[in-house]
Amino acid sequence: MGDLRYCFEQDKVVPMLKKMKDGLAVIDSDGISGTTIKDILEKNPKLLIYDYLNPCALERERSYYEKFKHLRIAKYASWSGEYWIDVTNKDWQEYIINEARKKKAKGAIGLYFDNTDLYYMCKEGFEEKGTKMMRKAPSANSVYKALAHIILTIQNDVGLVVMPNGGDVFLRRFMIEYPNVIQTINQEGVFFENFKKNSTSDTNYYKSWCKWAQKRIKGKVRLIEYCTDEEEQRKIKAYCTRHKWHVYFSKHKNLLGD
């Protein structure tokens, strides 16, 4: 299956790509020129790239933050400087789709499509999590329609594979209503979250979700596990091998590609 690495830190991406000869690199190409990426791909033609796209959240560090900050819904609890965003806004949708086009032009064949859990947040409500609202949240159904539009446009018109990261509540609906569109999924923290072993119930929940999705896709189930314990890694890898899943172990909360 070749190498599998994830790197979302700008200064680490190019060194990681240069080390890889084949396999899949999942990167955030923001701030990296298409020429740089294409030069690497020319030297390593067996290397495949998926690029990061964040349709449901806005990060303060991004160059477009000021332009879209009026669409912030609430702070993202686990990441400083990140906010859930109103994906139903047409200007934002157009921007995200154009970003997908730019990423394809750089050499990506697919997207790591993050934070579709916004659908769940709008469905279940932000208030119960003690979140201070910055604007009224859109309805879950309107979020669903917006995400469906973005995904279908990116796959059918832009021509990129969409690999959602997480978002099981959204995907259980989308994959039934639009079968054969999603062909690969990514899931973080099935066994470990923030370098702590998950409860049995949480692990079983995510295992069940990944197995459900696997029956409906032709591509791979990919996991990111935040775990440094070698014995636990061995057990997880054996489980993934039995189920024909791919797994990447990260030593850091930020994905650095090591």
Task: Tell where the protein language model's regions lie, with residue ranges.
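Glycan-processing catalytic domains of CAZymes
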Residues: 1-258
